[in-house]
């Protein structure tokens, strides 16, 4: 299968039809907008990948230091890529097709504001990696206002035992939330303030922006899986969080309406864009899409994504999980019939550290790192802390530094590569340990694994041995998010039923834990945690 490079615009007559299951000549176009890559994938009526087209997402960086680092995306460039890539795969659709449905999944917490009347952007998209609000978040976290919120949460939880108040006890603002990045941007932009006063400013993450563009501004919506990661959505109330909005003086009137993730038509793309109207049957956050694409949809199912960052997700069913250690209670997806929640822990630096190591010349290609790591001694006395973006769950230290600890004159490149891969596994184990402390997980039969970095056999085997659980890698591991968006969009179109999803998800290699390796890795993990302590609060 190759990346399509056709640029011809497809002109088709997509019949609306009725939602009869298993239409043999129906397709789903799933678009996955990640941090570094945007890809459009064409799936057939059996949810098999028929073709795809992809491109790099261009990030614009500015700022002289980490504290003021700005990371942005040109919205016009992104929308042009979106349309072009979708058209690339549409040329492979039969002219007499019954229906084409679209599913969209996107990186979370990258946002933009625009004039609701003209769709004119007020600024570039502000990436989740952007640090412009880092100092503001720190000031707020030290403020009496937030301390009062934490104390109030503790008191109310003591008397009510409600999970919502338990979460409030530990609530902290982090830069990845959209709240303060938007407020900083609003303070810098007089045009935005005028639009707010006139009631014309629209705010949205990538999903909301795309739907507005596809419908020429007619539809202004978001959905809970994307909204729940922003920091201004209350998963316990299943609505925008009035308390937080009022505390930080966030202009609530700029927020989009909330709709479902899938199960019904969310919007219909204007026919002028793709040559015919296309129904959008699903939209959601990328990690939730990957969760569904891995076949993890029942309570207790576990998924690990290894991509730009590492994400560990546990499906919690009908109830959100209230955590004291930075495990996030998120909406997995919402349909007209029900809502499903997921608990998430993350580590920001996975492929990031591998790309950095490659740039230093530690290896020629990421594909060879598995064999290189295998060639290094098992008891290498070297430790790596993957903290270019700080240390997230469960440590939650934005000021941690990245470091090799234990370098010696006889340290080799192979040792360094092995240590880097082990550090990714150690972060997963750290998160997993906290999950086990806070949640009754019961017997977990298998963990599903996906993401580009999961192609690394050494890393998957290390995770399996360390967690002492089987790890099952899905087929087409780099496409799991697109697959999830396609599966949900196909449900909306009636192409398959929920009880058929398991048969549509294909799994690949199964990694089983090694008892000897488990003992050695546990010992090394203890030393690694000691090394980590030396890197915490480094930039304070």
Residues covered by each model-derived region:
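Phosphate/oxyanion-binding active-site loops and adjacent basic polyanion-contact surfaces
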Residues: 74-82, 421
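Glycine/Thr-rich phosphate-binding loops that ligate phosphate moieties of nucleotide
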Residues: 2-58, 64, 100-142, 316-540
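Broad, structure-driven detector of short, well-ordered beta-strand segments within folded domains
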Residues: 29-31, 69, 304
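Conserved non-catalytic scaffold segment of RNase H-like nuclease domains
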Residues: 65-68, 72, 76, 88
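Short, structured active-site "lid" loops
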Residues: 73, 279-280, 471-472
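Glycine-rich phosphate-binding/catalytic subdomain of phosphoryl-transfer
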Residues: 67, 84-366, 529
């Amino acid at each position: 299968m190759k990346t399509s490079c056709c640029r011809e615009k497809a002109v088709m007559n997509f019949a609306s039809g009725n939602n009869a299951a298993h239409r043999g000549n129906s397709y789903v176009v799933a678009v996955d907008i990640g941090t570094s890559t945007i890809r459009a994938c064409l799936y057939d009526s059996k949810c098999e990948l028929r073709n795809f087209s992809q491109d790099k997402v261009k990030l614009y960086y500015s700022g002289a230091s980490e504290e003021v680092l700005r990371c942005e995306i040109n919205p016009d460039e992104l929308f042009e890529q979106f349309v072009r890539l979708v058209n690339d795969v549409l040329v492979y659709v039969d002219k007499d097709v019954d229906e084409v449905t679209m599913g969209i999944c996107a990186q979370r917490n990258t946002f933009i504001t625009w004039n609701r009347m003209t769709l004119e952007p007020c600024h570039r998209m502000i990436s989740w990696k952007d640090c412009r609000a880092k100092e503001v978040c720190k000031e707020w976290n030290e403020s009496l206002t937030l301390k009062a919120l934490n104390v109030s949460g503790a008191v109310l939880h003591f008397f009510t035992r409600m999970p919502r108040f338990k979460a409030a006890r530990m609530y902290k603002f982090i830069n990845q939330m959209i709240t303060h990045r938007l407020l900083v941007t609003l303070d810098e932009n007089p045009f935005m303030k005028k639009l707010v006063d006139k009631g014309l400013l629209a705010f949205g993450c990538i999903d909301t922006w795309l739907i507005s563009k596809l419908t020429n501004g007619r539809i202004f919506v978001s959905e809970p899986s994307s909204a729940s990661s922003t920091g201004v959505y209350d998963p316990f109330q299943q609505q925008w969080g009035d308390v937080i909005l009022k505390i930080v003086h966030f202009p609530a009137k700029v927020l989009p309406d909330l709709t479902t993730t899938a199960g019904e038509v969310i919007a219909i793309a204007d026919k002028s864009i793709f040559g015919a109207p296309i129904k959008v049957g699903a939209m959601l956050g990328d990690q939730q899409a990957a969760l569904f694409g891995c076949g993890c949809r029942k309570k207790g199912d576990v998924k690990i994504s290894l991509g730009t960052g590492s994400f560990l997700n546990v499906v919690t069913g009908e109830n959100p999980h209230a955590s004291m250690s930075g495990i996030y209670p998120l909406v997995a997806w919402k349909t007209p019939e029900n809502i499903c929640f997921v608990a998430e822990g993350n580590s920001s630096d996975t492929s990031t550290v591998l790309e950095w190591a490659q740039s230093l010349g530690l290896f020629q290609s990421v594909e060879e790192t598995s064999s290189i790591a295998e060639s290094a001694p098992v008891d290498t006395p070297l430790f790596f802390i993957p903290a270019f973006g700080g240390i997230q769950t469960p440590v939650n230290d934005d000021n941690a530094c990245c470091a090799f600890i234990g370098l010696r004159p006889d340290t080799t490149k192979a040792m360094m590569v092995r240590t880097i891969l082990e550090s990714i596994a150690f972060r997963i184990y750290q998160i997993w340990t906290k999950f086990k402390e806070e949640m009754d997980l019961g017997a977990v039969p298998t963990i599903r694994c996906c993401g580009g970095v999961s192609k690394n056999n050494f890393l998957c085997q290390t995770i399996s041995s360390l967690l002492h659980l089987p790890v099952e890698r899905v087929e087409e591991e780099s496409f799991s998010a697109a697959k999830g968006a396609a599966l949900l969009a196909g449900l909306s179109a009636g192409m398959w039923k929920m009880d058929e999803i398991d048969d549509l998800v294909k799994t690949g290699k199964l990694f089983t834990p090694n008892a000897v390796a488990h003992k050695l890795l546990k010992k090394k993990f203890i030393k690694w945690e000691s090394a980590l302590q030396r890197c915490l609060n480094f930039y304070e």
